[in-house]
């Protein structure tokens, strides 16, 4: 019996030891890593703001010029509650905003950053093209070499659209596209070379040139060929020789980066198509008339606030000064293309390299305030 009791005692001892090992307190866990605190400037930039309105704004003066005159042109920042004249702000504000407005300091405008080559190619969705094409020839040049048969008929010569001539240097074209991509990115816009019909806005079926009051001029077959040639060039990265340059007074502007001939197609005005009635209280300062219908409820506008192209950045002339018309070197024309309304920007004279592009914002309607334009 003795051996049995010894064995039992040993087994119990082993169980106790094992139990002690299992119930032994574990080592304290490592202290959590220190939390990274955001700087106060970043917190304030993202925090929602609330303006405590004063009872009387009669003593408000412009923070730039110090004058309290021209009260109808004084804007109040919805964040700092300070006043600024529309013409004193940089860039200049051309009309009183309908919604909220922030001064340049409170808006936290970011510095325009440069994009890499890969990002530029992806941004514009450039298609690779293996075969070399003639970028400078126009449909008119091709027809010069065709043999004509039949009787000769004399008729009035009509001016035709010319395709733009892109820069020969690929690095220069990349720079040009980079300036446009940076400007669109700064405004949180997508690139689009087409009219866009989004849900909740005007459908494509509403864009019919036959609704235009008084009719709309039809784009000829030859000019349609020029248009399609320019569109094909843009898709493969052969962009017009233009640079988007930021000006402290005018904001984003467009400059010629090469010689542009008279009657050259520059760009189509693109963006979201919507009814004018839906944009009566819209703060977008770049809306373009697309269709002026007999029935005002059917009139359409192009709204380049979410998507667009370089046409959105071309400046307007001042209709209230003698020098305004002298600056104009482009015109905005509306055409019927396959039954739909389209808007094009075309050079009205030869444009030299380094010259800024201007056209008349009030070419069709005198609705746009240009008295503060440079």
UniProtKB/Swiss-Prot annotation:
Per UniProt, the keywords (alphabetical) are: Chloroplast, Chromatin regulator, Metal-binding, Methyltransferase, Nucleus, Plastid, S-adenosyl-L-methionine, Transferase, Transit peptide, Zinc, Zinc-finger
**Chain positions recorded as S-adenosyl-L-methionine binding sites:** 250-252, 312-316, 368, 374
The record's Gene Ontology biological-process terms are: methylation; regulation of transcription by RNA polymerase II
Q: Which GO terms describe its cellular component?
A: chloroplast; chromatin; nucleus
**Cross-referenced SUPFAM superfamilies, in alphabetical order?**
FYVE/PHD zinc finger, SET domain
What function does this protein fulfil?
Histone methyltransferase that specifically monomethylates 'Lys-27' of histone H3 (H3K27me1). Has much higher activity on nucleosomes containing H3.1 than H3.3. Involved in the formation of constitutive heterochromatin and the silencing of heterochromatic elements.
Family the UniProt entry places it in: Belongs to the class V-like SAM-binding methyltransferase superfamily.
Q: What is this protein called?
A: Probable Histone-lysine N-methyltransferase ATXR5
